[in-house]
């Protein structure tokens, strides 16, 4: 079920028929491309899609820091920060800010001023969790608002999952795990007693270039529903071991890691699971529900800004980066064609058709909630909306003003209400015993 939002789409389409046609002449196309000097561009473009970044880039310049008083005492912490004005730094809401090569982390609050003349914005600093901001020159804005469950206000169990690529760290957070006194008091006031925890677990799958910390924003909702949550790492995400080729599978390979996480949940008391996925994590969850041997345990999917149509998404980024369509087509072949995929370092080609779900809407068997910002300029929302129009099992809830996977950051109350309401209506978890607590940090 979709909510209507009409945005323009590129006129030229990278269709399955186009891809198939290029595949039939891959050798000839590559020869011509090399002659024209475009093969190198296509290879670079394709590798940008499947090669994991070595480390996140601190791409936000820090212009100045503000203090609560003009007389700055030694050790006094700044209360505001002036940074470059970008689409992301201008967005409303609360965000994390990494600095000092990731060693430092602070929570930034709402925008307090925008200075268009020098293209900067000022945001409040809610809390500095670690590091010294006094001399920083650059940082990285992120949707992550807590880097571990303790920072989010919850007790967690550190576990290891035995993935096909090796042991990988994960957190397990059981119901009633809040450590924050205010959170506990809100729960106690709203609930006549401690509820029995649900026998449904939530398996949390982060997106491309992110880590499991991205998924901690869902803790408030899963705790309200009495769900145990498992926040996993997976191959090539800088926490879990790399795969043999060290390449993203865009969901085509990573689902095997989620299969192991489901096994763990079932072996530790779960009778069923809900998969939560952000961005590429949404693609991974869709593949898991389609292919995993334990897929019958999956009750529902909850997806945030998911990448659901890789053919359209690659075409979109071809257009966004002003790359000629023929080079984008060749880049697709370097991912999908056995004769060319070695150019990207892939051990095996990826079937983009299999992970482009609007073309496979009839194969969906699990109730799916999709939350996606209509202002997402990195993974556009249209495939999410289209999938809801094509499948009666899919519900689409649009958000506004949120950059990619920042739906929670822009409107945490709507995110909480949407998730708890949708899952409760399907008798998943216990009924929420409280409204979302107002403690920022998850």
What are these regions (language model features)?
Residues 402-416, 431-434, 441:
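Catalytic histidine-centered segment of alpha/beta-hydrolase-like enzymes
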Residues 1-151, 441-442:
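N-terminal targeting or regulatory segments adjacent to alpha/beta-hydrolase or S9 domains
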Residues 222-241:
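Conserved alpha/beta-hydrolase
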Residues 291-351:
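Hydrolase active-site cap/lid region
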Residues 366, 380-389:
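Short alpha-helix in the alpha/beta-hydrolase fold that links the catalytic acid
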Residues 247-268:
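Alpha/beta-hydrolase active-site loop
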């Amino acid at each position: 079920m979709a909510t209507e939002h009409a945005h323009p789409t590129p006129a030229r389409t990278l269709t399955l028929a186009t891809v198939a046609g290029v595949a039939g002449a891959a050798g000839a196309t590559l020869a011509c491309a090399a002659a024209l000097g475009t093969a190198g561009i296509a290879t670079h473009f394709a590798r940008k899609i499947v090669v994991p970044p070595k480390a996140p880039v601190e791409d936000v310049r820090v212009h100045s820091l503000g203090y609560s008083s003009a007389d700055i005492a030694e050790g006094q912490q700044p209360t505001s920060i002036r940074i470059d004005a970008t689409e992301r730094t201008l967005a409303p809401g609360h965000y994390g800010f990494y600095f000092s090569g990731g060693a430092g982390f602070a929570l930034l609050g709402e925008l307090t001023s925008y200075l268009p003349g020098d293209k900067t914005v000022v945001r409040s600093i809610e809390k500095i969790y670690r590091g010294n901001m006094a001399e920083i020159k650059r940082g990285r804005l992120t949707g992550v608002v807590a880097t571990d469950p303790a920072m989010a206000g919850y007790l967690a169990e550190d576990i290891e999952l035995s993935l096909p690529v090796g042991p990988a760290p994960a957190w397990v957070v059981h119901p009633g795990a809040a450590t924050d006194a205010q959170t506990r008091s809100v729960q106690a006031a709203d609930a006549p007693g401690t509820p029995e925890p649900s026998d449904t677990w939530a398996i949390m799958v982060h997106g491309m270039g992110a880590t499991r910390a991205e998924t901690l924003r869902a803790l408030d909702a899963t705790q309200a529903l009495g769900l145990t949550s498992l926040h996993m790492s997976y191959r090539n995400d800088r926490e879990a071991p790399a795969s043999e080729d060290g390449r993203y599978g865009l969901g085509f390979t990573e689902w095997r890691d989620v299969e192991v996480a489901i096994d763990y949940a079932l072996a530790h008391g779960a009778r069923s699971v809900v998969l939560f996925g952000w961005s590429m994590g949404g693609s991974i969850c869709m593949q898991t529900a389609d292919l995993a041997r334990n897929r019958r345990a999956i009750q529902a999917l909850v997806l945030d800004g998911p990448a659901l149509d890789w053919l359209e998404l690659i075409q979109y980024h071809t257009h966004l980066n002003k790359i000629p369509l023929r080079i984008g087509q060749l880049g697709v072949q370097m991912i999908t064609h056995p004769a060319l995929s070695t150019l990207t370092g892939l051990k095996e080609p990826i079937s983009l058709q299999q992970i482009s779900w609007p073309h496979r809407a009839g194969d969906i068997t699990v109730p799916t909630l999709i939350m996606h910002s209509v202002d997402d300029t990195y993974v556009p929302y249209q495939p999410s909306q289209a999938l809801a129009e094509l499948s009666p099992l899919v519900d689409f809830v649009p958000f506004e003003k949120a950059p990619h996977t920042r739906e929670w950051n822009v409107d945490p109350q709507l995110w909480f209400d949407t998730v708890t309401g949708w899952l409760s209506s399907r008798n998943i978890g216990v009924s929420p015993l409280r409204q979302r607590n107002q403690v920022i940090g998850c």
